[in-house]
Amino acid sequence: MSDYFTFPKQENGGISKQPATPGSTRSSSRNLELPKNYRSFGGSSDELASMYSADSQYLMDMIPDSLTLKNEPASGNTQMNGPDGKENKDIKLDEYILPKTDPRSPYYINMPIPKKLPKSEGKARAKQKVNRADPSDLDVENIYETSGEFVREYPTDILIDRFHKWKKILKSLIAYFREAAYSQEQIARINYQMKNAVKFAFLTDLEDETNKLVDPSISKLPTKKPQPVPLAAQKLDSKYDTDVEQPQSIQSVPSEEVASASSGFMKFGSGSIQDIQVILKKYHLSLGSQQYKISKEILAYIIPKLTDLRKDLTTKMKEIKELNGDFKTNIGEHIKITSRLLNKYIASVKLLDEASTSGDKQGEKLKPKHDPYLLKLQLDLQLKRQLLEENYLREAFLNLQSAALQLEKIVYSKIQSALQRYSALIDSEARLMIKNLCHELQQGILSRPPAVEWDNFVSHHPTCLMNLKSTDPPPQPRRLSDIVYPNMKSPLAKCIRVGYLLKKTESSKSFTKGYFVLTTNYLHEFKSSDFFLDSKSPRSKNKPVVEQSDISRVNKDGTNAGSHPSSKGTQDPKLTKRRKGLSSSNLYPISSLSLNDCSLKDSTDSTFVLQGYASYHSPEDTCTKESSTTSDLACPTKTLASNKGKHQRTPSALSMVSVPKFLKSSSVPKEQKKAKEEANINKKSICEKRVEWTFKIFSASLEPTPEESKNFKKWVQDIKALTSFNSTQERSNFIEEKILKSRNHNNGKSSQRSKNSTYITPVDSFVNLSEKVTPSSSVTTLNTRKRANRPRYIDIPKSANMNAGAMNSVYRSKVNTPAIDENGNLAIVGETKNSAPQNGMSYTIRTPCKSPYSPYTGEGMLYNRSADNLMASSSRKASAPGEVPQIAVSNHGDEAIIPASAYSDSSHKSSRASSVASIHNQRVDFYPSPLMNLPGVSPSCLALDGNANGYFGIPLNCNSEARRGSDLSPFEMESPLFEENRTQNCSGSRKSSACHIPHQCGPRKEGNDSRLIYGNEKGASQSRLTLKEPLTSKGVEAPYSSLKKTYSAENVPLTSTVSNDKSLHSRKEGSTNTVPATSASSK
């Protein structure tokens, strides 16, 4: 658009000072001049003449100063302000011009009108900016460099400044991306260096060239190349191959993969430490590669695109500057001309209206050029020219703004695309970092327990380490009772009596202290009671002779006096802690007296005399010394002429019993020679002679204590019983009966004590039964003639219907009974070492130790009960129908109760409990209590000895009135002692056998049996059961009566089956010595 509006010069040559505006004074209209090219826009000379003629002044004088309304009236409101801002009710809207803010007004413009700077100011500012510009940049960019001045409010200038700022943003982004690419490249080099720093010499590694998994522990041996084969040989081989039938290819079965690597750790990929080298190297290698990729992507894609965009933006800024001329407009001058013509038109119309109303004919005469029609025509043509200029300016604005909008959208989208690409690269780097390091560690070594490597290491070295995992409990140390070997419960290997005695031989004049052990076949004399000390120990040296009258004498025979333990053979626990090892020299007795050729010559309360053949195991000088004193017994090969009878036996036969057999058959002559030499030495070191030994009570004081006297009586009675038999088999049967009667008696005492007492006393020997049972009491003896030839092992078939309780008892019976305990004390038949306090306020019960054949593997359980609980629970019933406690025998001699839930046969439950339930006349309720699990309360029909499937494994006392026919379990119906052992007492309410454990019942009301009286004694904590007259059993033959009648009344103990308190507790001596809570299972 050209600047066609110019201000014409006045006659005096000056330019009009101020153009006329609508609403100006009348004199201002005279100074208005139109541009020279007004005709080119449709203007005529008549319009100019009419517009600027001097005779048109009368029209202009008729109109007011301004015809434009100040305020636009509201719709439906006739009140408005006039041109002077005063309210006038008589103003008509059609007589005034609308304001320029109204789109209907001829003065309204709907776009901004650009303002030009003065020529001198614009040139000076442009020159100043060009001088400060960088010669390397474009002129258009340098002009709009940021400075302290504001940008001119012009459309092109504003947009150029806008895109100049975008160029600066692109320049900063390009600089940042260059630095980011450089930093990624540097970090990639660092990651490669860190990858090379990961060095574990023996873990699985990544090969640098191929990135394959390799095991550094496996040495790489070079593969041998095949030798070249000549062509003739190849043809010959191919000919043979065609003739021979090709066998089928055999596919080798792949060996099972080893779970452990060659380094000793778990295999790679199992989440072990073996993965750490591959994980770290893989992480740094992948991260370095990704960072190199990011650097190349930034330099090759992001930065070039931003650089090209910046260049294109510079070109577009030049194009915008070229549009600067499109915004040069004279719309303001057109508005002024329109205002002049509009005022003339309004004045002519007003003049004619006023003349017609007043009737003045002079006023109606207007000049022809001031005809309202002609003035309106000129006004419409001017308005048309004004609208054309206005539309042209609008098109310029639309063109510029739409182009700028598209350009900025392109710039913004390019920046978005570059940032999105960069963000995707960084995101891939972060995901790679999380995947290759974090996830690998979290799913691998971080998710494993700390001991997984140790468990794998231990399991792969079974030859040098125990297969003990971290979650496994530590293995229990094996005890001697856990060892199983043939004949481990043979009665021939039992210790009958042990302790210190004073001995006097025929050649000596004084008594000598010695440690004696009475077994099934021999009476051995040892140096000391400590079998765990070496021969160089101070305790193995000779000690002074101990006589009953003088303890400070020196031992003349050279035997070891030892310490002064109790008469039962127990040692001081402080001394047992210093034992270091087992010395073979301490296990050989000084002398041994065979019971097969021995007889009890005399016995009193304080002494007894034995005659027989003695074997000496001392060195040769001892044998020579003894032979010099008794010339008639010097040669062991002579036949003894005296004492002919059952004791007559050649010394050679006696000597062979005690000679240990160390020889082994071998085909090598040297070994045979060596064995013969050893046999000759052993024969020379053993001497035999007929002796007569006198024994006395050993006591630390001048007078023996009652306990020592009592123990000495037991020695006398046991020796009497053992020397009365002619063969080892008879003596073995006697020991078996002794063990059985002792256990039944102890269990009965335990049951009685748990009912009527709250204290525990030491164990009473089974020999005392013969002393304490009165003739009037009911006794039951065993017939040894019927049982002399009984089988020592009864095979019980394991049928399918055998109940679980019987099977458990069979398995629990396979528990070894050691001959010596952990403290070095010898185990004595019929007695247990009781460690419970004497007051009986608390007791300890342990479950059986785990044995190779026992299904029960639980740890030891401890039950502590006070006296109050015992008293409170003693009034309850021992058992109820269906509740059968089980007994397990441990190596400590204790009993633990297996719950009755182990039984699967309900008939077996009821049958086992019937022996207890038959005592009561009415049904009682059962209250579970821990007291019911105590020893002595369980039925006697359970296995009481540890011999599996043997004689002592047969359930005893399997007889009851309520158990007949199908009520008996298959296990008990197969027992050969079921019918043989049944006897009936006077009351008729229960049946009893020789091996029956007396069951005690709680207090109840008096029933039909008039002999039973229930009452509460004064001061007693619980009710007790008393009898008016004793219960007896008649027609029972005494055991071993046919073997030796002279000793039957004194030697054989009798087992009582009386179930009252009087018969069990009213004893002549040692009434406080009751049976402990634990059974004698350790014998």
From Swiss-Prot:
Present with 300 molecules/cell in log phase SD medium. Its main location: cytoplasm. Belongs to the RGC1 family. It comes from Saccharomyces cerevisiae (strain ATCC 204508 / S288c) (Baker's yeast). Keywords: Cell cycle, Cytoplasm, Phosphoprotein. The modification Phosphothreonine is found at T817, T857. The keyword Phosphoprotein applies. The keyword Membrane does not apply. It is found in: Cytoplasm. This is Regulator of the glycerol channel 1. The lineage of its organism: Eukaryota, Fungi, Dikarya, Ascomycota, Saccharomycotina. Positive regulator of FPS1 glycerol channel required for the glycerol efflux. Residues 1-46, 69-89, 534-582, 979-1083 are annotated as: Disordered. One of its GO terms (cellular component) is plasma membrane. The modification Phosphoserine is found at residues 136, 249, 252, 481, 537, 652, 765, 813, 866, 879, 918, 966, 969, 975, 1059, 1081-1082. SUPFAM superfamilies: BAR/IMD domain-like (SSF103657), PH domain-like (SSF50729). It comes from the Eukaryota. Residues 495-606 form the PH domain. The gene is RGC1.
